[in-house]
Amino acid sequence: ENEISKTIAEYTINYKKTHSQTLLPMLDEIVKMTDMNLDTIDAIAVAGGPGSFTGLRIGSATAKGLGLALKKPLIHIPTVDGLAYNLCYTDRIICPIMDARRNQVYTGIYQMDGDKLQVLEAQMAVEIDELAKKLCTYGKPVIFLGDGVPVHKDRLEKELMTDHDIAFAPAHMNQQRAAAVGMLGIQYYKEGKTETAMEHKPDYLRVSQAEREREERLKAEKTHE
C-alpha cells in the first residue's frame, strides 16, 4: 500500500506519423528495452476517450487485443481524467480542455486530495462559455491544460473569467502522458475499476463528423421527399 510507484518506461512522440504507424512498434520497443515478461503485468490501462476517432479506435483495439491474448483486465481511463492527473498535488481546481471544435471542448472538473484524483464533474462535451460559468460557481482558483488552451485562452482571460484566478499548465504538462494514465490506472485498479477486454469500448462522447454528415444528408433527403 505504501510502496512507491516507479515508471519503468514511457514513449512519447508528437509528430507527423499516425497512431497506426507508431503504436505497435513503440510497444514492441518498450517490451524489448525493459526485458518485460508480458505475463507478469496485472492490468492494461488505456485512455478510452474522448479524442480523435481514429486514434481511439486504434488504441482501444490494441488494448483489447493485448487483454484478450494475455487474459488480463483493462482499466478504462477517461482521457480527460488522465490529463488532469498530470497536475497531481496542485491545490487549484483542474480543468482539462480538449478542442472539440464548434466552440465546444471535451472536459471534466477535478481536484486533488494528495495523490488521489477526485472527479467533481465527469467528462463531458460542452460549450466553452457554459464551462466557464460552471467553474465560476466553485469560487476557487482554476488551472487549465490540454490542446484547447491555445484555442480558448484569450477568451477565458479577457472575457469569460476576467474576475477569477486562472492559470495555464506549462507546455511539458499540457498533453496526454502515458505515465499519468498508468499512475491513475493504479488508483482505479485498487478501487476495483476494471473491465474485461470484451467489455471495453472507446467513449467518443459524440458522433463522428462522418456520422454527423450522414445524419444531415438523411434529414435533407427526408425534407425533399
Where are these regions (language model features)?
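Conserved hydrophobic/aromatic positions in well-ordered beta-strands
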Residues: 1, 106-110, 203
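Patatin-like phospholipase
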Residues: 1-3, 7-12, 134, 207-210, ...
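N-terminal beta-alpha supersecondary unit
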Residues: 1-48
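Surface "functional belts" at beta-alpha junctions
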Residues: 6, 73-175, 209, 221
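Phosphate-handling active-site elements
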Residues: 32-39, 68-77, 193
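DPxDG-like acidic metal-binding loop motif
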Residues: 46-74
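Acyltransferase
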Residues: 167-225
